Structures are given as structure tokens and as C-alpha cells.
Amino acid sequence: MKRDANTWNEILIQCRVKPFTAANWAAVFAQEIGADTFSKGESEIDDFLGQILHESALLEKMEEGLYYKTPGRLMAVWPSRFASLADELPYLRNPEALANKVYGGRMGNVRAGDGWRYRGGGLIQVTGADNYRALQQSTGLPVYEKPELMRQPGAVCLRAAIAWWERNIPDSIMGDTTRVTRRVNGGVIGLADRMALTDEANRALA
């Protein structure tokens, strides 16, 4: 079934998305998602929505949060990178410097500033120049050349999430939110909310 923007606006609102945000995204969802978008068709859309809505804080956040201000927090998150409070000081309240510190020199980030340039972005986050490049090569989306597109509401961001989903989530686990979450998250962080959002999406799509 191909849903129009008004229908998608209502679906997103029923899934707890703020009305202003839903209005900004509705036409994009209407354009990009139809009955044949996913390999399992309509039955897969609720699983997809449940995950991307949780991952993006209900379509409000498409960028990795790298603003830290509490001493000791960086040591807890990246213990191999920060051995002392003194090590942390230049990177507190300095997300660009932090991204270059923790991501520079790996994941294909070889140029100065690549850690920040290719920080986590997207409805399902992609991190690192190698992963942005691979996504561009597999989809044709210009996300390696213009990584900022992954951090902005729009068709590129949604298409990238769909492409990642189709490559990484096998049809055999659809409907099993716990197993799907492990694929998306690497664990089960936020599982209860993901389950609730998947159920809400299922009802809204009916």
C-alpha cells in the first residue's frame, strides 16, 4: 500500500512523534516507503519504524551525541582513550575535538578532521569514513562526499536507513523485536521502548 503524506503524518503522530516533526517528515516517508520497499513487504514496516524511532529519539536526533561536560564520563565511555581527568579536559564541551580524538586514525578516518566529518549520523547511525564510503558505493547516495546529509531530515537519511536495514536484518527474524534489536544495537538497550514503538506502529499502519 502506498500511503500519502497526510496518512504518514497521522501514523508518525500515533507513534509519539511530535506534530511539527511529523509534518517535516511525512512527505519523505510517503515518497520513500511503499509496499515493495522492504523484502517482506508491508509486514516489515512496523519493525523498521519501531527501531528507527527509538534510535533517532522519535526523529529528533540523527547525530551522535558527543557533547560531554561531566568530569569522569569520558573515562567511563572510552577508558582506553582517557586515563585521567586531566586527559579529559580538552575534550569536555568540545564535541569536534572529541570526535577527532576517539575516531581519528581508524575506520578509514585518515585525514585531519575525518573523525568529526564522519561521526555517527543517520536514523540508524553510520560511523567512520569506511562505512560512509561503503554506503555510498552500495546505494549511490552521496553520503561519503556529503556526510552532513546523514544528519539532516530528508530522503537521503531515510533511504540510507532502509538500505542498511535490508542488508543487515534478515527476513527470518522479522517480528522478533529482541533479535532485531540485537542486530541494530549490538545489545538490547531500550528494548522495552522499541517493543512499544513497534506495537504502536503496527496499530497505526493497520
Task: Label each PLM-derived region with a short phrase.
Residues S172, R183-A206:
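Low-complexity, Gly/Ser/Thr/Pro-rich intrinsically disordered linker/tail segments
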Residues I52-E55, G128, M174-G190:
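Acidic helix/loop microenvironments that form the catalytic cleft of cell-wall polysaccharide enzymes
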Residues E42-A57:
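Active-site-adjacent structural elements in enzyme catalytic domains
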Residues A155-L158, R167-D171:
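Proteins synthesized as precursors that undergo proteolytic processing into mature forms
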Residues K2-N24, L53-A160:
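Peptidoglycan-targeting cell-wall enzymes and recognition modules
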Residues Q14-D46:
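N-terminal carbohydrate-binding/catalytic regions of secreted carbohydrate-active enzymes
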